[in-house]
């Protein structure tokens, strides 16, 4: 049974790629057709590749992997934070700070500073400090939380990274490659799939599409952590939708 159905993908708009002039030719094999200047992703491949990604992530989680979700564009930020948290994992959803992986020791020092400021507030230190100093500390904490809050409790460099829009998150991809960390990603028609270890051809610009795929990756982690029986709630029957239905939906959406 497939993890995701063609119907779910269609309803979330996962099939809509970028304008044809903005494509990466390396994505040609994942493109079904072109409609009104827009590339349409081959969802039959996406169904299978979501299965592959799900199994990869599930297996990693079953082996106690640390998994980092990355998506800093506004369409991805909320889903990335929510689903990573639901799965008990970690996320970066504002801006990727250069060196997050390759200069982890420096990042750890910044995280330690964030925890130190939080502790100062908790133990009453703020109450005896001048208001001006407290204001500066709060400003520093807010900035650190914005960029590092999602990895504050990450115990080590991640074992797997899941990325929404690797075209935008190229620095994250490069750092992962340098350290040999496998990358699972939603790859739209404008991205380079050669950089990605586990590809999910998908529209990475629609909020519903991002939420759907990202939630499946979170489900995979939960299943990996709890065993197959616990995953029954997450598995939905995949209808045997035909390629003809894609044509009908695509033509309907573009008329």
From Swiss-Prot:
GO terms for molecular function: structural constituent of ribosome. InterPro entries: Ribosomal_uS2 (IPR001865), Ribosomal_uS2_bac/mit/plastid (IPR005706), Ribosomal_uS2_CS (IPR018130), Ribosomal_uS2_flav_dom_sf (IPR023591). GO terms for biological process: translation. Keywords: Ribonucleoprotein, Ribosomal protein. Belongs to the universal ribosomal protein uS2 family. GO terms for cellular component: cytosolic small ribosomal subunit. This is Small ribosomal subunit protein uS2. The gene is rpsB. Pfam families: Ribosomal_S2 (PF00318).
């Amino acid at each position: 049974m497939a993890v995701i159905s063609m119907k779910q993908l269609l309803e979330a708009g996962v099939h809509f790629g970028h304008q044809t002039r903005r494509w990466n030719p390396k994505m040609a094999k994942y493109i079904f057709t072109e409609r009104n200047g827009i590339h349409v992703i081959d969802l039959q491949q996406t169904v299978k590749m979501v299965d592959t990604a799900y199994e990869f992530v599930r297996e990693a989680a079953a082996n106690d992997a640390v998994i980092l979700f990355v998506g800093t564009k506004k369409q991805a930020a909320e889903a990335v934070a929510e689903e990573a948290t639901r799965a008990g994992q970690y996320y970066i959803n504002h801006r990727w700070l250069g060196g997050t992986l390759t200069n982890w020791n420096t990042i750890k020092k910044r995280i330690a500073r964030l925890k130190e400021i939080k502790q100062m507030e908790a133990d009453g230190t703020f109450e005896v400090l001048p208001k001006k100093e407290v204001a500066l500390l709060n400003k520093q904490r807010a900035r650190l939380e914005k960029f590092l809050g999602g990895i504050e409790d990450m115990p080590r460099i991640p074992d797997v990274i899941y990325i929404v829009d690797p075209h935008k998150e190229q620095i994250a991809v490069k750092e992962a490659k340098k350290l040999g960390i496998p990358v699972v990603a939603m790859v739209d028609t404008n991205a380079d799939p050669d950089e990605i270890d586990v590809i999910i051809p998908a529209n990475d610009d629609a909020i519903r599409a991002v939420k759907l795929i990202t939630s499946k990756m979170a489900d995979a982690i939960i299943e990996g952590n709890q065993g197959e029986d616990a995953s029954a709630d997450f598995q939905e029957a995949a209808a045997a939708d035909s390629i003809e239905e894609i044509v009908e939906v695509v033509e309907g959406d573009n008329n």
